[in-house]
Amino acid sequence: VICPDLPLYGMTEYYGKVVYQDWVDCAAEIVMYYQAREIRPTFLFGLSAGGILAYQTASGLPEIQGVIATCLLDQREPLVRKNVVSSGWMAEHGLRLISKASAWLGFIKVPIKWVGNMKAIVNNEELAEVLMRDRRSSGAKVPVAFLHTLLNPHIHPEPERFSRCPVLLVHPENDRWTDASLSRIFYDRLNCSKDMKLLKGAGHFPIEKEGLMHLEHYCVEFLEECLAQRLVSNCQ
């Protein structure tokens, strides 16, 4: 299992300008690096915004057996944008300011919690406060240019033309940040083999015991089904 820190978050060091497409490129490079070292079936797992990132990464790579995501948030959709931001003011005015400022002031960093509703990242208020104080996590500062590109991603192919691999959406049932209906906007358009499961009792970051147990069960089941299908295809 490889769980990398992408630029702007975690312990990864970076230099120069960082935009959202860099995340897609980094994820693809990491996958190709490990695939070149060892031939194994490869699955991508995306948590929160990482769900659509996993989809984008899989879209550009030939040997991906499956994608698992807790959310599939298409930020191009106005309804999705409106619900992921921190406030009504941000939805009405802030996003427009970010778009206008990106060209000239894209290098300026702002706390991600000013833009995203980080208070709802988990359903435990104490843990949410800890995460928002962590400058390598929900308390991170990110460039305006990154925010602009995150909110205006280039998604190719569109889900109606995606047939690269099966997709499993394991959406938290009690997500107070991004309701499952927001992920369904993108999920329902997918033209590949797909399945959706709800993680009972789980918040946006599924830390609850019941939700984690369901997450493990659904993921293992999905992996086994995909690998069995791969074996059948190889024998034909």
Protein language model regions, located:
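Short alpha-helix in the alpha/beta-hydrolase fold that links the catalytic acid
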Residues: 165, 179-188
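Catalytic active-site module of serine/aspartate enzymes centered on a nucleophile-bearing elbow/loop
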Residues: 193-236
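Short beta-strand/loop motif that positions the catalytic acidic residue
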Residues: 163, 169-171, 175
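Active-site nucleophile elbow and catalytic-triad environment of alpha/beta-hydrolase enzymes
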Residues: 141-159
